[in-house]
Regions:
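Short Lys/Arg-enriched helix C-cap and helix-to-coil transition segments
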Residues: 80-103
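Short, amphipathic alpha-helical "recognition" segments used to contact nucleic acids or chromatin
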Residues: 37-52
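Helix-turn-helix DNA-binding helix
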Residues: 65-69
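Residue-level marker of regulatory loop/turn positions in helix-turn-helix DNA-binding domains and
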Residues: 5, 34-38
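General nucleic-acid-binding
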Residues: 1-15, 96-99, 106-109
Length: 109
């Protein structure tokens, strides 16, 4: 991926994160283990996955490397199956990504 394309992806991800935080009503703290924070992070990570690499997502989520992102992707099904709050956050995350992508003319492929 070219440097220019990478910068576009990171800008898009940052815009999505800001809009998502506005919609859910709080800032995501990257070090917090509170369930509400974890579910919010996992939801947005899974929603933006089709739009970039694991490293791009890690950068925008203030993580050191992609391993946390891989863990979040793997935990999606469990959260989705057992947490109504997570399902609501994931729906908001998907809508945020879709709306932001349409507004900015971004295609996931």
């Amino acid at each position: 991926m070219s440097e220019e394309k990478q910068q576009e992806v990171l800008k898009f991800f940052s815009t999505v994160r800001e809009e998502y935080e506005n919609r859910i009503g709080f800032k995501m703290r990257t070090q917090s283990r509170l369930r509400v924070q974890v579910e919010a992070r996992v939801a947005i990570i899974n929603a933006i996955r089709p739009y970039g690499t694991l490293m791009n997502i890690a950068k925008v989520m203030d993580k050191k490397d992609h391993s946390t992102i891989v863990h979040s992707l793997k935990s999606h099904e469990t959260h989705f199956a057992f947490s109504p709050n997570y399902r609501a956050k994931y729906k908001i995350a998907l809508e945020t990504v879709r709306d932001t992508a349409v507004a900015n003319g971004v295609d996931p492929h």
